[in-house]
Amino acid sequence: MSEDFNPWTHVSSLIERAGHLLQLDEGMIKRIITPERILEVAVPVRMDSGNVEMFTGWRIQHDTSRGPGKGGIRFHQSVNVDEIAALSADMSIKCAVVNIPYGGAKGGVRVDPTTLSPAELERLTRRYAFSIAPVIGPETDIPAPDVNTDPQVMSWIMDTITMLRGYSAPGVVTGKPLAIGGTLGHAGATSLGVTICTLALLKNLARSPENERVIVQGYGKVGSPLVKLLSERGMKVVAVADVKGAIHVPEGIDPDALARHYGEAGTVVGLAGSDTVDSDQFWSVPSDIAIPAALGGVITEKVAETITASVVVEAANGPTTGEGAAVLHERGVPVVPDVLANAGGVVASYFEWAQDLQGYMWEKELFHQRLEKTMHEAFDAIWIRHGELGVNLRETALAVGVERIAEATRLRGLFP
């Protein structure tokens, strides 16, 4: 991805293109593109040394025509307003694609969290939460974990808002530990959503999952459970990559053996019975389905030209560059876009929020049942519209998301 790439300009152009495909008027397109609120905050933090350091944070609510804002909080040294704005728009589209009653939001602080002590991280989190407190809440905007944030960070945010408001507010964030209002089933929800979309695509292509060869790039929070889920459904995961390298087992990787090995070695490399694959050759491993489940921008034009898989399912956020997507389209390789494929995570957040508001927690079986239903319905709607619009699945998903936002905006009208 080039240094002059602007994520906000890119996302805006995608929404504009979807609007033109739907023949929306320019006024509606501009309303959908323009963020509703951009909050920039100063985040002073007293460091362990006694000095006070200044950081900058943001919370952006892109669109709330369909419900409260929803989107993660990231702590990273590269965070900027254009990135957060683009991600908030992505969340608007994603929530509309899976048809849950949320709009899109995103937040972040420009900081390298690896340089902070645990105490400094807590102070940073609480001060940031205090600064954005006027614009977040169960009925307005519900943050969640993202890059370098986790259930502990969500716990600190929830506690800070609870102290400010004088009553318990578990629904102010999702992705919390079970002990304070988290939900059974949240862990692995993104991976389950990816699996459901993969199976749905195979069904619509009249292909059986049995013995479909899959390669998975990434063995973290998404990739690890994904390998097991795909294997349980009859597919053969023949190659897996992580940051330290990649392995290939033509007859299929034993997911339990891989999990044990990874727990001991900290990498997939070296699994007994596997061949080591150079990272630049990973996408060329003979396969039927390729699933990027780690970084963005990995399926470049060059990779797209050499990838052997006949299907791509995007478990990561933005794993395919514009040039790579164009090549895959030219080659006739269907791609289930990230805005649909990895939406299981935000659906899980919606379920957690609903349980917090009800004060009634579901059993894991009910959680999974409702997640599968939601993802199946979302995929089916995209597939049907894909046939009607005559464009690829990525453009169709964007169009469906924009169409649903436009409908809500039109119905609500303009105040005053």
Residue spans for each PLM region:
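Glycine-rich, N-terminal phosphate-binding loop and its surrounding beta-alpha-beta segment
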Residues: 40-113
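Short, Gly/Pro- and small/polar-rich lid/capping loops
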Residues: 2-42
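Conserved active-site and cofactor/substrate-binding residues in soluble primary-metabolism enzymes
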Residues: 6, 10-13, 79-82, 116-127, ...
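Rossmann-like adenosine-cofactor binding region
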Residues: 245-335
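Adenosine-phosphate binding glycine-rich loop
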Residues: 2-5, 201-202, 306-416
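Glycine-rich phosphate/diphosphate-binding loop of Rossmann-like nucleotide-binding domains
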Residues: 176, 182-286
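Glycine/serine-rich phosphate-binding loop and adjoining beta1-alpha1 elements at the start
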Residues: 96-210
